[in-house]
Amino acid sequence: LNVLDLACGSGPLLKILFDHNKNLNLKGIDMCPEELGLAKNLLLNSGVNLIESKAQNLTAIDDNSVDIVLCHWALTLMDPIAPVLDEVRRILTSKGQFAALVDGPMNSAPAYKEVHDLIYSYVQEEMPSYGKIDLGDPRIRGSESLSNLARKAFPEAKVTIETNVVSMEGPVTQVAEIAAGFFYAAFVLKPDKRKSM
């Protein structure tokens, strides 16, 4: 199987895929050379092909050549989004699949808004303007608008949007640290501030 991690960042999903099945033909694309450098170090001797490119311009990948395109929490940040979906459609095989993980609405899970607000309050103490502007196309954040975008880009495909809620158990500090990892905002905090959060 030919699998593409779209906006692969530092490569954690590619590493999981490689460790799980060494027979996959894996590619990762990201626009950030620094992230790709981290991915290269993480994936030493794996044979994973890493490509520097924007998601709106996947010319390094042939038409109808990818069986599965995965996009883990990056589609939300992309704008314009229509060319991204057009490129995904172009590179997918006729039976190919596209799966993207995106943020859901604030009311999608108990305590999600409270965790979000707590993290952002700490970040905004240091950077008052942080979070005032949402990156990416806002249509990605709504189920109906996302469904409409996907149906337009993939008119022949079965489009399904599922709400999945992550559930965690364990010591409070451990759960808090893991939950903070789901928010980009938590990574802009200095280590001491993040620890106090």
Predicted features and spans:
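Short, conserved SAM-binding segment of the class I
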Residues: 83-87
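A short SAM/SAH-binding and catalytic strip from SAM-dependent methyltransferases
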Residues: 68-81
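Conserved catalytic/acceptor-binding region of the Class I
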Residues: 82, 97-169
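Class I SAM-dependent methyltransferase SAM/SAH-binding core
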Residues: 2-58
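Surface-exposed loop/turn positions
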Residues: 1, 65, 95-96
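C-terminal helical/coil "lid" or tail adjacent to the Rossmann-like core of SAM-dependent
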Residues: 158-197
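A short acidic, Gly/Pro-enriched loop at the edge of an enzyme's catalytic core
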Residues: 56-68
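Helix-to-beta-strand junctions that scaffold the AdoMet/dcAdoMet cofactor pocket
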Residues: 78-79, 92-94
